[in-house]
Amino acid sequence: MRNEALVGYLLHQRPYQEKRALYYLFSQQHGVIHGVGKKAAPLFMPLQLFATGKRDLKTFSQINIASQDNTQADSVQKDGVQKDSTPAVLEAVPYANISGQHQYAALYINEILWRLLPTEDPMPILWQHYQISLQQLKQPLSNSELRLCLRQFEQYLFTELGFTLTLTHDNVEDPIESDSTYRFLPDVGLLPVLVHNEESEHLASESGQTVFKGADIIEMARLGITEQTLSHWSKLHRHLIDHLLDYQPLQSRLLWQQQQRYQ
């Protein structure tokens, strides 16, 4: 890669030198790319830059907020023709940014991406859904709408990572039964749990992140991610995210919890 024009979003950054930072960029062309560039690149805004380097750590130069036309990668070659790649002037592009509590949701999306996605693996469909999610987070959303936005994005992420959630059958291909109880194991699927009726509620309260009633699973499969099924999907997705992260804490989740305590 030599002086290649990229369009992407900054997911994460770390101090590197006095005037430079280590960036995790989610690019339209190559997926997540690690690079070093001048400090002060903004989050949640489309960036246009140039990347150079043969190894995993690239050099990023001319980092600027992309013009709205360039967010669809108009700056790179199409049909063998190099279009104008002049970066937009930062002050000249009137993008609205994400503010308030929605920032915590956007930070969460960024964190699960930079921690879970492989480097330099193009994911154009997920990149488009990331853009859509950021646009949603710039709008006024109720608590339910915010959670729906996150659950829907997580589902696209699971698909890219190769996880298919089967909710119509258990781990041995028997149909889900409404009056049964199931435990979800990410690498196995839904396992029937043999309990007496009087023990069912106690089991669910002790292992709430992994145990589901059959009737709830059937409803999830029938309706998808809706306000009616949102709490069940949130429980399932959280367990799968934690599994993928090897149960290491998410900093964005901790920030959200701290913010909620001080409200």
Where in the sequence are the language-model features?
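Non-catalytic alpha-helical scaffolds and adjoining flexible linkers that form interface surfaces
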Residues: 1-263
